[in-house]
Swiss-Prot record:
This is Phenylalanine--tRNA ligase beta subunit. It holds the Pfam family tRNA_synthFbeta. GO terms for cellular component: phenylalanine-tRNA ligase complex. It catalyses: tRNA(Phe) + L-phenylalanine + ATP = L-phenylalanyl-tRNA(Phe) + AMP + diphosphate + H(+). Belongs to the phenylalanyl-tRNA synthetase beta subunit family. Type 2 subfamily. Signal peptide: none annotated. Its EC number is 6.1.1.20. It comes from Borrelia hermsii (strain HS1 / DAH). Tetramer of two alpha and two beta subunits. It is found in: Cytoplasm. Residues 286-362 form the B5 domain. Its cofactor is Mg(2+).
């Protein structure tokens, strides 16, 4: 979970109220945070957040904004945001080339002026940058941020691509290096170049005079890519692979700089093709949608009889605007710096926090039950021990993923897959119907580790099933992957035989027609003429979709069918 360091005196000064340590500890519960360390000899404290969905809190300005709103009920206002119906005046442009759009498509920025950047501001911005990129940005893969002194930049800025021989002086060095050299020798290149390892061209940010700003998401340039104490005019840009995550990250930084006293000047990004928010987007940009909430659902969840007005006042403490047109429902307007409302349950949680956890009296359970492991759980644990004994490493994945990974890269149809109605990001669009895509994704980022690779997971998958009450069916599956240039159908066939031998289960094989496998090198597993799963050598086409260069064999079987 993210941890941030803040100066206690600056935080309280920004809140506008002197709080004791006990009072501060108590009120931080509202932000799902706790003080994990008081530094002796200085004014710093370290705060740990128990939620990764609130990047707006990962700085003293964002945290102070939330506490101030909670204590005094004043909704913050940011007039510099554009909306679909109200576009702000822009003070610079970012021009995106088709080539850059195909690699790392989204880039947005803004200018900030009017304050002298002091040491504490710079420390706060660098810390926010690190937390945004590492936690929310998935180690820069989804989102990365760059900060510059705009005094050295001539607009418009161009977001283009270059080959691996392109040379510039990267931040932290005093000599020119090629992109290839940066990737292999620069500390940041060693750490982050793998994000772009499947591309032959690389993103580059240039100003109007072709001066290099950065090689995103890896490293800024030495000349104008370093922010220093004393800088007054700033240019902030965020690149990413997810549109809403990139926009939100930029919004968070813009709100923080505004709260520090900077004037925020919007910048327009011009894309080579349409995006869900248009071909031209002036940022910071408010893109969040209102969410409808049922009053009955709230009261049923709490066992209460709150009025709509009560609920709106509770939400206001969290910075959330709400209005109602009907007595039985109301609508929330997310703050510009938040995008974590997927379902009305998320709003109900905010009402609970705004009202105060102490206002709800705990009740002891009225029923008594005895618990024990289910049959499928006992069976799964037995198989897990067998897999570990055969040299496999266990993996644990999310049940949600992207259409790209689950469907497109696997070269299958989406007919049986369950899609999420209101996905927060593109990475959570579908419920997985197979574990194999997750295993292949892990293998795609493991090429630097010694072979052979042997990984497995026992987990749940879900598919459409019109015969069930809710139209879906959830199964417990085992899947494993073996990767090495020496592995073939014979090796995985031997492992499958060993697994079923130790389970004392007889089975039959027949050739599989799945496009996942090389023709003639895949087999379905049958017991009593019922297909339990399949295994085989993965097709080179699918391996190339995941960027895997080493032969892989996979197996996936339905454990529920084995039991029943």
């Amino acid at each position: 979970m993210p941890k941030v360091e803040v100066y206690r005196s600056i935080l309280l000064g920004k809140i506008g109220k002197d709080l004791t340590d006990c009072e501060l500890v108590s009120i931080l519960e509202m932000a799902k945070a706790e003080i994990c360390e008081f530094y002796t000899g200085n004014d710093k404290i370290k705060i740990e957040f128990n939620d990764t969905n609130r990047p707006d809190l990962w700085s003293y300005t964002g945290l102070a904004r939330q506490i101030k709103t909670y204590l005094f009920g004043q909704l913050p206002s940011f007039e510099f945001f554009s909306t679909a119906d109200n576009l702000q005046k822009f003070y610079g442009e970012i021009l995106v080339s088709p080539e850059a759009f195909s690699i790392r498509p989204f880039i947005f920025g803004f200018l900030a002026k009017g304050m002298i950047c002091n040491e504490q501001m710079l420390e706060t911005l660098i810390q926010l940058q690190e937390k945004l990129c590492h936690n929310y940005g998935q180690k820069r893969k989804r989102v990365a941020m760059g900060m510059y002194s705009s005094a050295s930049i001539e607009f418009p800025v161009s977001y283009v691509t270059c080959n691996s021989d392109y040379r510039f002086i990267p931040l932290g060095m005093d000599i020119e290096m090629s992109i290839k050299e940066i990737n292999k020798r620069h500390p940041k290149g060693i750490e982050y170049a793998s994000i772009l390892e499947h591309f032959t061209e690389y993103p580059l940010l240039l100003d109007y005079n072709d001066k290099v700003l950065s090689y995103p998401p890896v490293i800024n340039s030495h000349d104008i890519g370093a922010l220093k104490v004393g800088d007054t005019d700033l240019f902030i840009e965020v690149t990413g692979t997810n549109l809403e995550a990139t926009l939100l990250s930029l919004s968070v930084v813009a709100c923080d700089l505004h709260d520090m006293g900077f004037e925020i000047l919007p910048v327009k990004t011009v894309f080579p093709k349409e995006t869900p928010f248009g071909k031209e987007i002036i940022c910071p940009y408010y893109f969040q949608n209102t969410l409808e909430v049922s009053v009955e659902s709230v009261n049923r969840m709490f066992g209460s009889n709150f009025t709509v007005n009560d609920m709106c006042l509770d939400l206001k403490k969290l910075g959330i605007s709400a209005y109602f047109k009907e007595l039985d429902k109301f609508y929330i307007i997310p703050p510009v710096y938040r995008n974590d409302f997927l379902h009305e349950v998320d709003v109900i949680e905010e009402i609970m926090i705004g009202r105060g956890l102490d206002s709800f009296k705990p009740e002891l359970p009225k029923d008594f039950t005895l618990g024990k492991l289910s049959q499928i759980e006992e069976f799964s644990r037995k198989i897990k021990n067998l897999m570990i004994g055969m040299g496999f490493q266990e993996m644990i994945y999310n049940y949600l993923g992207s259409r790209t990974d689950f469907i497109e890269k696997m070269n299958i149809k989406s007919d049986e897959f369950l899609s999420v109605a209101n996905p927060m990001t593109e990475g959570y669009e579908y419920v997985r119907g197979s574990i194999v895509p997750d295993l292949l994704k892990s293998e795609s980022i493991s090429s630097n580790f010694p072979y052979p690779h042997k990984i497995f997971e026992i987990g749940k998958v879900a598919l459409k099933d019109l015969s069930s009450v809710d139209g879906t069916m959830t199964y417990d599956n085992l899947a494993f992957l073996m990767a090495d240039k020496e592995f073939s159908f014979n090796e995985i066939n031997s492992l499958v035989s060993s697994l079923f031998y130790y389970l004392n289960i007889e089975f039959k094989l027949r050739e599989s027609s799945q496009t996942l496998y090389i023709n003639g090198r895949g087999a379905d597993i049958l017991i009593n003429d019922i297909i339990l799963g399949s295994f085989g050598e993965v097709s080179p086409y699918i391996l190339s979709n995941f960027g895997i260069m080493v032969p892989c064999c996979v197996l996936e079987i339905n454990l529920n069918k084995i039991l029943h």
